[in-house]
Amino acid sequence: MDLERLSPRNPVKKESWWTVLTLAYQSLGVVYGDLATSPLYVYKSTFAEDITHSETNEEIFGVLSLIFWTLTLIPLVKYVFIVLRADDNGEGGTFALYSLLCRHARISSLPNFQLADEDLSEYKKNSGENPMRLKVPGWSLKNTLEKHKFLQNMLLVLALIGTCMVIGDGVLTPAISVFSAVSGLELSMSKQQHQYVEVPVVCAILILLFSLQHYGTHRLGFVFAPIVLAWLLCISTIGVYNIFHWNPHVYKALSPYYIYKFLKKTRKRGWMSLGGILLCITGSEAMFADLGHFTQLSIQIAFTFAVYPSLILAYMGQAAYLSKHHVLQSDYRIGFYVSVPEQIRWPVLAIAILAAVVGSQAIITGTFSIIKQCTSLGCFPKVKIVHTSSRMHGQIYIPEINWTLMLLCLAVTVGFRDTKHISNASGLAVITVMLVTTCLMSLVIVLCWRKSSLYALAFIFFFGTIEVLYFSASLIKFLEGAWVPVALSFIFLLIMYVWHYGTLKRYEFDVQNKVSINWLLTLFGSSNLGIVRVHGIGVINTELVSGIPAIFSHFITNLPAFHQVVVFLCVKSVPVPHVKPEERFLVGRVGPKEYRLYRCIARYGYRDVHKDDVEFENDLICSIAEFIRSDKPLNYSPDPENESGINERLTVVAASSSNLEGVQIYEDDGSDKQEPSSSSEVIMVAPSPRFKKRVRFVLPESARIDRSAEEELTELTEAREAGMAFIMGHSYVRAKSGSSVMKKIAINFGYDFLRRNSRGPCYGLSTPHASTLEVGMVYIV
């Protein structure tokens, strides 16, 4: 299932109906697996203990009415028709909403923000709109957010809470989905046998599921959609059969009047049972979170014309069967499989297990994606990210997270041993994410859509009231399983916030202790300091977008030598999902031209994939060569903190892999196997006996460069032949004396523990390990 090929991010003017329908079909397997399997456990969880099924049928009809209107109002109205429109350049999810708010309110959790970042083509959605059209409440809200750091932190914490609950759902969804699917075995064996078989079978399936993650889903992705489609056809067909066979008048229960009768009769018990009913919308958030792989129209079509009617028919069919079967042999027989005709139970069981695995797979890969986004935005320690597909950028695998999820999932399964407690936990996680989305959407309506605050108030009041009602019913089950997502979210939130706090403090230290450019120019201009310049290119990795990092002076102090070409490289994330390759690099000079000092800023979106080290090196060198050739600052921002008064002018330079009309680089071992076109101008040097590699820059046919630029390119060629060395800081952060106890605990213990147990500073920066030198420094923050 090649989602990348049909992705709306590709430069297609308008998707054809065939493309839209194909995407809608594929979305069944990626987006709706979790939502489609909810009929397996909704009725069973609802009637677990709070309410009982009586001969009046008021309970079963009231529950059916609640399910119908919940499915209609939350997934259909809220998500399909409203929330899906709040995409971040085609991307969805909690971080997409947070990113939109950060850009429109000009706030950011990323410390190294630049005004030049606002020139990115994806930075402003609907950039043609006049910002003066923002209404008075919008201006007031925008100014309030910009002025108060506390509110910015609260907005970040709110987004992180939603993210942590999604991670918690990644633990609970596989457990409850597989548990409910396997529960069909209870009808073919005694209760004594069943209690010894069910848990081991569930654990075996879960272990197999998590063990296969490193292979990636692209190899089996093509069967996901057929499995979910077969499941939807199965439950809808069984539903239609049960409706006509047992109770054709069950449709009357769709009236809201039955909700009133249900709550009037059951009162507090009915309210407490809402925690089971809300499971009918579990997986709805995936419609928005997975928007980046599809289009709004394809997801809307798939839900409106396939998923929604199938689920309604399935729930109506179960209610029709139960309305004629009031005396059940055992408590656990209120469930999905009891309404399945006995002749087809085994095939349905097989399809249900496959559908549960597909639904679990979707939430697991979604958890991987969220962790990657958090890492990109500096809110999670660096972890190993493996790209399992060269064609589909979203297919990733994170070993540490995978095994952690598996252990937690097995612990939940073995610890609870039934769906009642797991459903209580899953319900709280699901409704919390939806509440966070509702809160963020109300801000998006005012700040991004520039609507009246009345629309935002109406949105948060209507949907917030429904969700708060479900949230309260889930929270009351805190001691009966609902504590699990709270505990998991608290742990992950603590990890994220401590890491983010430590990262900010480390950056503040870098800013306060950066070296004066005058010192650097004096160092380069003096011949009496014993500083030796060696062949090659020295790349100084730093998070600073201006100034000279302290690690460079620390390096020079201990090793008085530097390369003939020095590049201060900053690889940073920006609050957009993707940065176009032609806008990736910002290149400028540091000091006079003859010193061969450059600054290069590589910008990535929170969903971008970092290139491998060889391609990144070539793009970096070609961007500098293109800057030398053009030497005309296009988009630049002066550095207000420059202590020498020399402005660093930064030019947007396209990566060589995407700019065929720019400077191209050719490298070989001197055997002339690959010769550039004779119509292009070639900058090269005579083969040197010291270096085996030969480097040539091929300029565009129309390129005209002066003598000094040609000399500079020649020197860059010589330096590239000599090789590149990457120098980066390895920080040891400590709280300064006099800090509060909480700060000392957070920095000296929390952040230090996370730093020591996460990937090193060079990981994920597209730098070759063999050419990397780490400079240790102690940061007193």
Swiss-Prot record:
Membrane in keyword set: yes
Protein family: Belongs to the HAK/KUP transporter (TC 2.A.72.3) family.
GO MF assignments: potassium ion transmembrane transporter activity
Entry protein name: Potassium transporter 8
Subcellular location(s) per record: Cell membrane
PANTHER family attached to this UniProt entry: OSMOTIC STRESS POTASSIUM TRANSPORTER, POTASSIUM TRANSPORTER 8
Pfam families reported for this sequence: K_trans, K_trans_C
Extracellular domain ranges by topology: 38-62, 177-195, 241-273, 318-347, 417-426, 477
Keywords: Cell membrane, Glycoprotein, Ion transport, Membrane, Potassium, Potassium transport, Transmembrane, Transmembrane helix, Transport
Entry's Gene Ontology cellular component terms: plasma membrane
Protein task: Probable potassium transporter.
Residue intervals passing through the bilayer: 17-37, 63-83, 156-176, 196-216, 220-240, 274-294, 297-317, 348-368, 396-416, 427-447, 456-476, 478-498
InterPro entries per UniProt: K+_transporter, K_trans_C, K_trans_N
Membrane topology: Multi-pass membrane protein
Cytoplasmic side: 1-16, 84-155, 217-219, 295-296, 369-395, 448-455, 499-781
Keyword Repressor: no
Annotated glycan sites: 424
Taxonomic superkingdom: Eukaryota
